[in-house]
């Protein structure tokens, strides 16, 4: 019996391993796996259903069909275990060996493995240095290849056609050896001397100069070295033995009616075996060559189809015209082994049901239907019934539960007490999509959910379903309670704001309760306290909104924890006094002494959490919810059609707009504006009119006239239900009310362009047929978009998770002094994100100095919490250098100090926290939300009127950056530079406002001049881009030939003519090479030079430009020579946004990127070619100049003689992140990506902490390219993991050798995921075949560092609670590797001995 137990134990024990290696299998290895050769294509006997001998399901090879029973039935039962039956040859053992025993097929002719042949770049082709086409022709028996040239003039690896081969045979006889088919390739591979080849190539590499050749050689060297180091033999890429998958992994299942359902693999194997047997027979018969060849080709094709069907030629189809699923298809794709079974599995002990609202639940509870609980907790109930002696056996317990006896319900209650369950709502977009609750048994069949967690789940009660999971083990329950309980997840991991925030009705109730009303019943009472206020209200002596005086005692707790009491009589309302009763002690009364909208409530909970901690906040949140619901019901806020008050001014606003539009129409007809300008102006007029109507409507809705106690009429905030809902943030928004009571406004077509006739009606007035039809456009687009975009957003999240999954906090401090500079985000006249919000929760990288002094305000390595941020604000600090994950020096993972505060917990981050996944979820989750947002507005085009001026808001002085300008005739400045920035500086030298000033803008004030608030400092036309001259003189047309490069358009009505430049695409042959331009000449006809340069003033005109001047006209500096109509901008929403975010994270190069200066120096222009200019930058120190050819149509931002810094913009356009990294460094590219991504989310009002984006950027920057290898084993131009380069360099530095120099690479997230060190992680992401082929050839080891690899091999992940387990394993491994000679004194030894002896007791022997 004992050895039986030992045997069973051995069955369950898994091998301890630290890494997984993948390599090519040699024929001997395949044979060693195999339990026998499969010789026949038969599967099972159709009469007896027993497997055929030597067939694909043979019991002798693969094991018995029934447990411990041989096929003929001679040996049965356990006592014969291990006996091999002499009659049928089957070993008596468990059936499950049929899942692990493999067979093999001896191939009659070698066959190439299609993965190494066709997966690009072809490994066989690269190794032999032959083109893939040639190899394929040899393999599929179309041509010969020379294997040994001998003494002839034939080269090895030379391809011969049939005729050439016969000629050579005649000429040389058997001097040479040429073959066809896989044997030939196998022979070539076998004869290769890898090491010698490697030496040769390395010599060649040092000699060549051409870049392409170097690249090719490096690739070959890497492949050859991989073969040498991994111990793989090249000839193993050609199969001589084919392994056969265990039969239970390709089952054959009998269906009723005598038919069978079979795995496609059986068909594919059958094909291989049939062809192989036929080939053997033909070879035995010595059949004619052509027949044998054909059979060999067919065998090759059959093996190809088995390994990867459809990779070459047409896919082999089954009986139902569907391609058969080959081995490669089994592992790749969403339904493949990796993503279907290894990364996510279905679980038992789970159920799902519809959710309904549970407003009486506490935050940590959920309502679980009794029926469901009974089913989910069955085993626990059985156990309890037996324990109590109420049931003797499990069977009896089962019967009791089935009968649903009364005692069962009592026991269910006991079992469920304190046993948390997990609730999950699909799609689980971030970690708050699964939370733990304590179940409360309820009648009915729907799960009840606490309303406050709806925001985290993004759940609503319109039919959503949720799944329930039961954590079974004690550890799982502990984790669920400590980490996943809904009460522990109050703050959102994306931005650190509370996510358990009242919304909808609760907000309405609290808002209604805290509003005040003029002359309400009971105004002016003086009450002794909140309790009395409540009594007065309940007795009906005072209204909820009455303004009264109440005596309030506050217990104010500062963040340091000091408590001060103060009592005072405060002017407030009855409702606020009642609400004060549920506010926890420690918060000031001022927090509720205001009308509470959604923002105020969120701030209130946040303050509560920061000052009082978790428990009071949870209780407070619950109380606010109950109170909110109660008073929302009391308020009786309802919506009637009369609540949608249409403003009286609406008609006149629309009339004015219509007049303006008519005016523009006239201008268009008289040729003053182009069609595009007209369209844009019309749209702007209507957008502005819409804004005005909306403003009038909101003013109308938001106030009402009332009579106060003294009989005087005064205005108060309105109690209109619709207004209250929008104002509190409970339901609806100004944009939606505008559609109800203002005008619907402009609508968008499905392609995003705006229809220029707006819908002037609103929903209260009703739409006519045309208006209704126009609006259906937008509404349907919204629905279609949502369906398409949700998938895109999900895919973005998946890529982000994949690239960041192995980033974990691994140490406390890496000790770096580097960091990134944080400044407030200022856009236009408003601070979009103040400094405090950006640095809160970060660690300072340097001491922060008090401005204007030398005092240290904040020391280095301080975690900036709320008080520190207050201090920074008080001292008006403008810039802080904080630690960032991008500059963290930890090798694998990051350190806690570089990350800073754990946003969801509010303290510094713990070791083992999976920050990568959190970052990915935080960025990806809103993406999906945003795609859903669009259809709720119903297609109304949200587009701001185009900006045409800059109006400053504050007092201060102007500062212009990167500016060039000329004075025009009126003494105004005209801007001629393209990325000019205008800043407003206050008296402390802080930037208050910041604006972009476009080219051609006219400035009213210059650099350094003082302005007062509200002053307009710049004007421009938003719809055209002017061409401004910098010099005075006369116009001379160049290359402007009517009919070839330009057309004249004369207006019939006015007789005015304008010249339009043709787009180069529309020009005829001779016009294509001409460059239309305007030159400026002086009175003598000499070219006028641009001041400060020796370049003639000439302005190239891009296509579609309109010139309204004639040849020879006199002009002055600053005049507009021509206009280029700007394309209309479409609607602004996240559609533009999500793909933009994806582009940024994929680090895509924009189409026509900005050209940046490669080095610092002085600009000059060299010799021009036909279509390009030569830009020369000469460094100031006199070293070599840098030259670049730039197309002439690119607008240059620099002039001759100007000094530029490396990385400055030379020619405008969208910047390429790769250029920014190369020229300005890591921090600049981080800043660029962070700001651009934040821009998109900010537009939608979504807050994401910068940290998360930085985490992704760090992962994008994890590779470097070796510039010079030094003494390392790297190759020049090789791409390697930064951590590997750093470790290698540290080692070399310690030994005093030459280190490698490298440049950082920016990889897009898809590329970065596929380029990870771990092949398991990459293979389970995308392009599985390619990744595995590459890994196998190189014999890669996967160290199982990331999360994904560990999930796939079935271990705890090295993060969170699994972090300790992995640290422990690492320590054990190091201890076993390094034998230490202990140096101990005798006393210590005896003490230790005693300790060991004592500790030895009570330990199990397997620990």
Curated annotation (Swiss-Prot):
Transmembrane segments: none
Reactions this protein catalyses: RNA(n) + a ribonucleoside 5'-triphosphate = RNA(n+1) + diphosphate
Cellular component GO terms held in the UniProt record: DNA-directed RNA polymerase complex
SUPFAM superfamilies named among the record's database cross-references: beta and beta-prime subunits of DNA dependent RNA-polymerase (SSF64484)
Presence of keyword Cytoplasm: no
MF (Gene Ontology): DNA binding; DNA-directed RNA polymerase activity; magnesium ion binding; zinc ion binding
Disulfide bond sites: none
Keyword Transferase: yes
A Pfam short name: RNA_pol_Rpb1_5
Free-text cofactor note: Binds 1 Mg(2+) ion per subunit. Binds 2 Zn(2+) ions per subunit.
GO terms (BP aspect): DNA-templated transcription
Cofactor: Mg(2+); Zn(2+)
SMART domains with a match to the protein in the record: RPOLA_N
Keyword annotations of the record: DNA-directed RNA polymerase, Magnesium, Metal-binding, Nucleotidyltransferase, Transcription, Transferase, Zinc
Binding of Zn(2+) 2, residues: 814, 888, 895, 898
Protein residues bound to Zn(2+) 1: 70, 72, 85, 88
Function: DNA-dependent RNA polymerase catalyzes the transcription of DNA into RNA using the four ribonucleoside triphosphates as substrates.
NCBIfam families (alphabetical): rpoC_TIGR
HAMAP family: RNApol_bact_RpoC (MF_01322)
Subunit organization: The RNAP catalytic core consists of 2 alpha, 1 beta, 1 beta' and 1 omega subunit. When a sigma factor is associated with the core the holoenzyme is formed, which can initiate transcription.
The family this protein is said to belong to: Belongs to the RNA polymerase beta' chain family.
Alphabetized PANTHER family for the sequence: DNA-DIRECTED RNA POLYMERASE (PTHR19376), DNA-DIRECTED RNA POLYMERASE SUBUNIT BETA (PTHR19376:SF54)
Protein name: DNA-directed RNA polymerase subunit beta'
């Amino acid at each position: 019996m004992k050895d039986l137990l030992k045997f069973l134990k051995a069955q369950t024990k898994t091998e301890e391993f630290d890494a997984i290696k993948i390599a090519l299998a040699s024929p001997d290895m395949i044979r060693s796996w195999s339990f026998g050769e499969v010789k026949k294509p038969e599967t099972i006997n159709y009469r007896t259903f027993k497997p055929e001998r030597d067939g694909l399901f043979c019991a002798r090879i693969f094991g018995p069909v029934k447990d411990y029973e041989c096929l003929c039935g001679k040996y049965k039962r356990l006592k014969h275990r291990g006996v091999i039956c002499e009659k049928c040859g089957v070993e008596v053992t468990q059936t499950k060996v049929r899942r692990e025993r493999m067979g093999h097929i001896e191939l009659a002719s070698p066959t190439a493995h299609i993965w190494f042949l066709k997966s690009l770049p072809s490994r066989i082709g690269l190794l032999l240095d032959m083109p893939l086409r040639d190899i394929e022709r040899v393999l599929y028996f179309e041509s010969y290849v020379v294997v040994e040239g001998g003494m002839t003039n034939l080269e090895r690896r030379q391809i011969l056609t049939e005729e050439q081969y016969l000629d050579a045979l005649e000429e040389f006889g058997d001097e040479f050896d040429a073959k066809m088919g896989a044997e030939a390739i196998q022979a070539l591979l076998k004869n290769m001397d890898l090491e010698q080849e490697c030496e040769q190539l390395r010599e060649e590499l040092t000699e060549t100069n051409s870049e392409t050749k170097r690249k090719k050689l490096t690739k070959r060297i890497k492949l050859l070295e991989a073969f040498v180091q991994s111990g793989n033999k090249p000839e193993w890429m050609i199969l001589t033995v084919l392994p056969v998958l265990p039969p239970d992994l390709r089952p054959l299942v009998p269906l009723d009616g005598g038919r069978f359902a079979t795995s496609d693999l059986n068909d594919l194997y059958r094909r291989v075996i049939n062809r192989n047997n036929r080939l053997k027979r033909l070879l035995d018969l010595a059949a004619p060559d052509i027949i044998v060849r054909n059979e060999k080709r067919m065998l090759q094709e059959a093996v190809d189809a088995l390994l990867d069907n459809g990779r070459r030629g047409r896919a082999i189809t089954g009986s139902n015209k569907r391609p058969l699923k080959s081995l490669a298809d089994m592992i790749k794709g969403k339904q493949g082994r990796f993503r279907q079974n290894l990364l996510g599995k279905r679980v038992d002990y789970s159920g799902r049901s519809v959710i309904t609202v549970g407003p009486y639940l506490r935050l940590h509870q959920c309502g679980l239907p009794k029926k469901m609980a009974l089913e989910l907790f069955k085993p626990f109930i059985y156990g309890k019934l037996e324990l109590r002696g109420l049931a003797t056996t499990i069977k009896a317990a089962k019967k009791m539960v089935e009968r649903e006896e009364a005692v069962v319900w009592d026991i269910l209650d006991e079992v469920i007490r304190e046993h948390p369950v997990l609730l999950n709502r699909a799609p689980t977009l971030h970690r708050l999509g699964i939370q733990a609750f304590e179940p409360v048994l309820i009648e009915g069949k729907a799960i009840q959910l606490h309303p406050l967690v709806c925001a985290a789940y993004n759940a609503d009660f319109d039919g959503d379903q949720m799944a329930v999971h039961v954590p079974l083990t004690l550890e799982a329950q502990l984790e669920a309670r400590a980490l996943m309980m809904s009460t522990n997840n109050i703050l959102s991991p994306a931005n650190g704001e509370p996510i358990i925030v009242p919304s909808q009705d609760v907000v309405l109730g609290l808002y209604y309760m805290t509003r005040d009303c003029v002359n309400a019943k009971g105004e002016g009472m003086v009450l002794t306290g909140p309790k009395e206020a409540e009594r007065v209200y309940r007795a009906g002596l005072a209204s909820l909104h009455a303004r009264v005086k109440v005596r309030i005692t506050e217990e104010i707790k500062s963040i340091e924890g000091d408590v001060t009491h103060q009592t005072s009589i405060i002017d407030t309302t009855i409702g606020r006094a009642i609400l004060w009763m549920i506010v926890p002690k420690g918060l000031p009364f001022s927090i509720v002494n205001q009308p509470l909208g959604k923002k105020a409530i969120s701030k209130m909970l946040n303050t509560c959490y920061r000052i009082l901690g978790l428990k009071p906040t949870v209780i407070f949140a619950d109380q606010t919810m109950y109170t909110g619901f109660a008073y929302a019901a009391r308020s009786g806020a309802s919506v009637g059609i009369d609540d949608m008050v249409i403003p009286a001014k609406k008609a006149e606003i629309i009339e004015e707009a219509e007049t303006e539009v008519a005016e523009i129409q006239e201008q268009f007809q008289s040729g003053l504006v182009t069609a595009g300008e007209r369209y844009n102006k019309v749209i702007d007029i209507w957008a502005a009119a819409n804004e005005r109507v909306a403003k009038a409507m909101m003013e109308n809705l938001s106030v009402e006239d009332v009579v106060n106690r003294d009989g005087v009429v005064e205005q108060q905030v309105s109690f209109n239900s619709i207004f209250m809902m929008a104002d509190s943030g409970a339901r609806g928004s100004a944009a939606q009310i505008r559609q109800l009571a203002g005008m619907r406004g402009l609508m968008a077509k499905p392609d995003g362009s705006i229809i220029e006739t707006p819908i002037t009606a609103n929903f209260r007035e009703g739409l006519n047929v045309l208006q209704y039809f126009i609006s259906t456009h937008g509404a349907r687009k919204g629905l279609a978009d949502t369906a398409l975009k949700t998938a895109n957003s999900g895919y973005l999240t998946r890529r982000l998770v994949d690239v960041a999954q192995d980033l974990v906090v691994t140490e406390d401090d890496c000790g770096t002094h580097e960091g990134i500079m944080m400044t407030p985000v200022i856009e236009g006249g408003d601070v979009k994100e103040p400094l405090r919000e950006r640095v809160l929760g970060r660690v300072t990288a340097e001491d922060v100095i008090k401005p204007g002094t030398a005092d240290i305000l904040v020391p280095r390595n301080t975690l900036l919490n709320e008080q520190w941020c207050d201090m920074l604000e008080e001292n008006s600090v403008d810039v802080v250098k904080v630690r960032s994950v991008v500059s963290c020096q930890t090798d694998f993972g990051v350190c806690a100090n570089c990350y800073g505060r754990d946003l969801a917990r509010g303290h510094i981050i713990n070791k083992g926290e999976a920050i990568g996944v959190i970052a990915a979820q935080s960025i990806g989750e809103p993406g999906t939300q945003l795609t859903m947002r669009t259809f709720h507005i119903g297609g109304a085009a949200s587009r701001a009127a185009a900006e045409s001026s800059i109006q400053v808001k504050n007092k201060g002085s102007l500062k212009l950056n990167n500016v060039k300008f000329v004075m025009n005739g009126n003494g105004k400045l005209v801007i001629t530079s393209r990325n000019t920035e205008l800043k407003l500086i206050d008296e402390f030298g802080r930037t208050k406002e910041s604006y972009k000033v476009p080219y051609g803008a006219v400035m009213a004030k210059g650099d350094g001049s003082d302005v007062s608030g509200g002053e307009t400092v710049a004007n421009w036309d938003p719809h055209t881009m002017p061409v401004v001259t910098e010099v005075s003189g006369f116009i001379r047309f160049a290359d402007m030939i009517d009919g070839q490069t330009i057309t004249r358009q004369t207006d019939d009505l006015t007789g005015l003519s304008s010249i339009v430049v043709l787009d180069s695409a529309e020009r005829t042959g001779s016009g294509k090479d001409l460059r239309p331009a305007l030159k400026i000449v002086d009175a003598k006809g000499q070219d006028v030079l641009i001041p400060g340069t020796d370049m003639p003033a000439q302005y190239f005109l891009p296509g579609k430009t309109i010139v309204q001047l004639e040849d020879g006209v006199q002009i002055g500096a600053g005049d507009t020579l021509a206009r280029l109509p700007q394309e209309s901008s479409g609607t602004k929403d996240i559609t533009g946004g999500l793909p933009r975010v994806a582009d940024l994270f994929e680090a895509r190069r924009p189409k026509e990127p900005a050209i940046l200066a490669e080095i610092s120096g002085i600009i000059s222009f060299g010799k021009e070619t036909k279509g390009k200019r030569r830009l020369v930058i000469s460094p100031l120190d006199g070293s070599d100049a840098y030259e670049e050819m730039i197309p002439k149509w690119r607008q240059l931002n620099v002039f001759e003689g100007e000094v530029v810094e490396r990385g400055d913009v030379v020619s405008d356009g969208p910047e390429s992140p790769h250029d920014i990294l190369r020229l300005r460094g890591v921090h600049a590219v981080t800043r660029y990506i962070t700001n651009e991504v934040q821009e998109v989310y900010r537009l939608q009002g979504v807050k994401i902490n910068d940290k998360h984006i930085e985490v992704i950027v760090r992962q994008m920057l994890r590779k470097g390219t070796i510039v010079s290898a030094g003494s390392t084993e790297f190759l020049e131009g090789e791409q390697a993991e930064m951590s590997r380069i750093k470790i290698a360099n540290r080692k070399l530095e310690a030994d005093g050798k030459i280190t490698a120099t490298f440049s950082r690479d920016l990889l897009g997230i898809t590329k970065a995921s596929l380029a990870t060190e771990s092949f398991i992680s990459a293979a389970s992401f995308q392009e599985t075949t390619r990744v595995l082929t590459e890994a196998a050839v190189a014999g890669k080891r996967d160290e199982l560092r990331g999360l994904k690899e560990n999930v796939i091999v079935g271990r705890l992940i090295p993060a969170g609670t699994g972090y300790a387990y992995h640290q422990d394993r690492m320590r054990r491994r190091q201890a076993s590797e390094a034998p230490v000679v202990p140096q101990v004194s005798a006393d210590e030894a005896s003490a230790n001995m005693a300790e060991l002896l004592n500790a030895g007791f009570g330990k199990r022997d397997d620990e």
